[in-house]
Amino acid sequence: MSESLRIIFAGTPDFAARHLDALLSSGHNVVGVFTQPDRPAGRGKKLMPSPVKVLAEEKGLPVFQPVSLRPQESQQLVADLQADVMVVVAYGLILPKAVLEMPRLGCINVHGSLLPRWRGAAPIQRSLWAGDAETGVTIMQMDVGLDTGDMLYKLSCPITAEDTSGTLYDKLAELGPQGLITTLKQLADGTAKPEVQDETLVTYAEKLSKEEARIDWSLSAAQLERCIRAFNPWPMSWLEIEGQPVKVWKASVIDTATNAAPGTILEANKQGIQVATGDGILNLLSLQPAGKKAMSAQDLLNSRREWFVPGNRLA
């Protein structure tokens, strides 16, 4: 029974906490929890515990918060727990080879893509950005590479035309625990079937930056609309008007050809703010000026119509 495995859990954000909660709810024996050190957050920059730490302490589990797992004393914390397996979900620290080899069954990771597609830091966002039809989670055996280990279990889900990174995150946070619990059972009873990743199918999910999220009107309307969903809720697609950043929460594509230069405002009405792109027209539907709440294009036009005069070009 997988419930008898001695499990170390390592994770930090809410996505990881949902996996820990599922393990505990299904009766698994979690002998210790590793999470990142408390970080300053909020306006007061008060030290805040991670969601994983909060849950672990609620459940009375031993919590360890090393700054790194490279020092011998940090590695000894892992060794002393004599775990059968270490489950790693969005932990945020590198596991050295010595740590990977400590548990009897090694370390397994829940990754938010269908490997080998989208190895790396931002798999959920990149699957949307690229226009993938589906994504999912992969449970893999960890090795010293970046998401290069053998795949143990996969679950997939479709990506809809309405999905944002936020909604996709929630879907994968439901799928991941299902896959994890199944994988632990297979590891415990010896039925897991590791599958080597096909290196010819590898793509990398590079980290997002605020600068990348700045709208580049030379791109196609379809690509920009995907970017707006991929970068929601962070870092948020944005444009600059009169030196102010304006976030874009929602847009749609109008498949009409235009000879106008990319960035040219074509129409601004209750249907939205229509802007020429490198290919097609992007219709801005929901925007958020600096210091304000998100609002419909119509509401923004009521107060800032001078920003969106047809014929003007957005930077």
UniProtKB/Swiss-Prot annotation:
**Record has DNA repair as a keyword:** no
Query: Where do the annotations place (6S)-5,6,7,8-tetrahydrofolate binding?
Result: S113, L114, L115, P116
- A Gene Ontology MF term for this entry? methionyl-tRNA formyltransferase activity
Would the keyword Transferase turn up in this protein's UniProt record?
yes
GO cellular component labels: cytosol
Under the heading SUPFAM superfamilies, the entry gives: FMT C-terminal domain-like, Formyltransferase
Q: Specify the domain of life of the species encoding this protein.
A: Bacteria
Instruction: Report which reactions are catalysed by this protein.
Output: L-methionyl-tRNA(fMet) + (6R)-10-formyltetrahydrofolate = N-formyl-L-methionyl-tRNA(fMet) + (6S)-5,6,7,8-tetrahydrofolate + H(+)
The UniProt record lists the EC number as 2.1.2.9
Print the keywords alphabetically.
Protein biosynthesis, Transferase
Q: Which InterPro entries does the protein's record reference?
A: Fmt (IPR005794), Formyl_trans_C (IPR005793), Formyl_trans_C_sf (IPR037022), Formyl_transf_N (IPR002376), Formyl_transf_N_sf (IPR036477), Formyl_transferase-like_C_sf (IPR011034), GART_AS (IPR001555), Met-tRNA-FMT_C (IPR044135)
Q: Which PROSITE patterns match?
A: GART
PANTHER family (UniProt xref) = METHIONYL-TRNA FORMYLTRANSFERASE (PTHR11138), METHIONYL-TRNA FORMYLTRANSFERASE, MITOCHONDRIAL (PTHR11138:SF5)
Biological role? Attaches a formyl group to the free amino group of methionyl-tRNA(fMet). The formyl group appears to play a dual role in the initiator identity of N-formylmethionyl-tRNA by promoting its recognition by IF2 and preventing the misappropriation of this tRNA by the elongation apparatus.
| Entry's family note | Belongs to the Fmt family.
**Would you tell me the protein name for this molecule?**
Methionyl-tRNA formyltransferase
Organism per entry: Shigella sonnei (strain Ss046)
Gene behind this protein: fmt
